[in-house]
Amino acid sequence: MIAEAENEYNGAPTPLAEECLKEVRDRAGISDLTGQITSGEDFLTIIKDERAMELCFEYLRRFDLIRWGDFVDKMNEQAVLAQSGNNWTQGGQAAPFFRVSSAYQYFPIPDAEKAVNKLITGNNPGW
């Protein structure tokens, strides 16, 4: 997170951002990229890949994708793969009609919450 924040704030990887990324990659036994990446966009792509691999079972991916603006596209790509029958999901049974819209970036406001707070007159967009 520090590497991502440094990169976003400064528009390019800083020595601190590179050191944070190096620490993660060293722990995993992966080669160091320090000094090889000068573009903020390229550095962010590497951070996205690192977070996907490092935190794959931590239930953070959804929030990362929403923060980066990639959620709807990435989830719809996965739905197509799930329906293709050429992967571990065993074909169309895994996601027969599933398509993600921008509404899925938010959770709906529960009816119980709306019932006790009359100032909540609607719901999140798409719900």
What kind of region is each of these model predictions?
Residues 1-127:
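Acidic/polar-rich alpha-helix caps and helix-coil junctions
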